[in-house]
Structure formats: C-alpha cells, structure tokens
Design a protein with these regions (language model features):
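Bacterial N-terminal signal peptides
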Residues: 3-16
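Aromatic- and Gly/Pro-enriched helix-to-coil junctions and flexible linker segments
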Residues: 16-117
Length: 117
C-alpha cells in the first residue's frame, strides 16, 4: 500500500514538473536552428524538396524532421569529426536535436511570431 502511495506521489510530481516546463515553440526555439543549419537548402529554388522558411511550410514536416535529425541524416555532413573541426560543419548539436524532437513530440506549436530571430 505504501509503495503504491509513494509511486503515485512520484508520478504526480513528475507530471507537475513537466507541466511547468516551458514549451518548445517554432519561432523561439526551432527557427533559429533552421536558419543556421537548414534554410540554405530548404528554400524555394534550392536542392531540398521542401521549404523551412515559414512555420506553415515547416509544420507538416515536424515528425520527419525529428526522425532525420535524430538519425543524423540531416543536415547532411559526411566528414568525420574524429579528424578535426571543419569550418562549414552544419552538424547539429545534441541539444539542437533534442529541441526539434521535443517540438515535434508536443504537436509542433508555433509560438509567438514576435519571438522569431
């Protein structure tokens, strides 16, 4: 009985903490990552098949972006970082991949356009 009570308290504490965590939004969190690493190709007239210049264009691709970045397929980078740092390296940091994943997992919210970079 005590074990169930403690487990219930722990679960409710985690849920309360998660509810207080700030939401990851497109304009505040994801758009800066896209501008720095993705939009040179993901724009009209460039090599990528879809544009990531606006929320409306990007939103349908949220789950695919999560999968591609988590698998390190995107952004493409074929040099081996074990051999040094490369000037044009657009590889995402794990923290950036985590932001994209959280954004996709929480329904890819737009957020406030005033938060855009």
């Amino acid at each position: 009985m005590l074990g169930k009570l403690l487990a219930g308290i722990a679960v409710s504490g985690v849920a309360a903490f998660a509810a207080d965590a700030p939401a990851v939004t497109f304009h505040k969190d994801v758009e800066p990552i896209l501008q720095a690493n993705c939009q040179s190709c993901h724009r009209p007239g460039q090599i990528a098949p879809m544009s990531f210049l606006t929320y409306q264009a990007t939103r349908p691709w949220a789950k695919a972006m999560k999968a591609a970045t988590a698998g390190r397929k995107m952004p493409p980078w074929f040099a081996d970082s074990a051999y040094g740092h490369f000037t044009n390296d657009r590889s995402l940091k794990q923290s950036e991949i985590d932001v994209i994943s959280k954004w996709a997992d929480h329904g890819a919210p737009e957020g406030d356009p005033k938060d855009a970079p």
